[in-house]
């Protein structure tokens, strides 16, 4: 009798372990979050800092910025919901770029895009390169 109870117990565990538990966030709604407000740009050397006010949304997950790094590359930067700044880095020139900033919630819904224009200053590598001088060392 004990053997039948034990076998039934083991069989129950085997059946229960065959199902895969759901991992991840389920889609909770189809309502997009509000757009960011008061977007301001601080242009830095080879980069830019965008500050903003977060929208009031309970399931806001992150803020995403999309911009064209050069002719061939479209880049994205993301910032956590726990900060109000987004940094765009790695810009090798001083050309103006349009950045599209959207808020994304846990369901993947995106807000209306807010367009900001950044004008990065001269990158540090170009400033240092201009000041370098190459001279022979030993001869």
For each predicted feature, which ranges?
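Sec-dependent signal peptide recognition
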Residues: 2-10
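C-terminal motif of bacterial Sec signal peptides marking the signal peptidase cleavage site
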Residues: 14-17
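Pro/Thr/Ser/Gly-rich low-complexity, intrinsically disordered linker/stalk tracts
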Residues: 19-59, 112-139
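Beta-strand-rich interaction surfaces with strong enrichment in secreted/lumenal proteins
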Residues: 38-39, 75-78, 87-89
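Surface-exposed coil/turn segments at beta-strand junctions on protein surfaces, enriched
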Residues: 43, 79-81, 90-94, 133
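Extracellular low-complexity, O-glycosylation-prone stalks/linkers
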Residues: 54-78, 82
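Beta-strand-rich modules
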Residues: 86-114
């Amino acid at each position: 009798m004990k053997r039948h109870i034990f076998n039934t117990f083991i069989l129950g565990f085997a059946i229960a372990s065959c199902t895969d538990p759901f991992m991840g966030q389920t889609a909770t709604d189809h309502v997009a979050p509000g757009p960011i407000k008061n977007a301001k740009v601080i242009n830095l050397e080879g980069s830019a800092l965008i500050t903003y006010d977060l929208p009031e949304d309970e399931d806001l997950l992150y803020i995403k910025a999309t911009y064209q790094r050069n002719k061939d590359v479209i880049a994205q930067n993301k910032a956590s919901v726990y900060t109000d700044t987004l940094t765009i880095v790695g810009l090798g020139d001083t050309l103006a770029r349009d950045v599209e900033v959207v808020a994304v919630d846990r369901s993947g819904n995106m807000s209306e895009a807010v367009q900001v224009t950044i004008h990065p200053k001269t990158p540090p590598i170009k400033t240092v390169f201009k000041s370098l001088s190459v001279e022979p060392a030993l001869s």
